[in-house]
Amino acid sequence: MKFAYNKLYWDKYHEKVSVKINPLKNPSLLLTGSSGAGKSYSLKWLLLNLLVEQKVNLWFCNYKDSCDFKFLKLHEKYYTGEACEEGFQKFYEYFLEMQKKSEDSITQMSILIFDEYPAFILRQQNEDKKKAEKYTRMLADILMFFRSYKGGCWIICQRADSQYFSSSRENFHNRILLTRGRPSKESLQMLGFTKDDLLDTKYNVGEGIAYVDGQGLFQIK
């Protein structure tokens, strides 16, 4: 599926050259960027590209009830606000059920998209630390093991602080940092990037850097 466009080709030749991924091999995504960097538009574009190529059992947790995803409100596995707890739990239970099946018997992908996951975890940490730890472990299990059963998780957030992910950030098969101007050293480190990975030019809305497992680093737009 189309994952992004290569910024280097666009800047030099004004040619759209796609960065492509196999979502069955790389099903999980960490999409980060400050407010106004283009995350919502990018997410909708990525979701469209996925659905064009794959039959997907889609779960969507819109924690802050963003109007960008209201078009999904009639979808049976669409959750907002506090109901995201239910959605996350049900997806995890589904993941456990899939583990009981043979890999060859699974005919479609299963993806959980969780918008503003850190805000969700932060609230849990403030109200019930044990519950927050449970959800953090659930995410780690999904990222570590669900790929074998055609499943994964897309997390969308402004900052990928380690307190929200424990050690599971490294298990995202695809990582995107969208940035306007020049990203901070801290925001780069959160996704495993360094300043040496950046171009000399500033980045515009919808542009940034990405890592694809098995392919490496890309400058994207």
Positions of predicted regions on the chain:
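Substrate-engagement module of ASCE P-loop NTPases
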Residues: 87-99, 131-155, 181
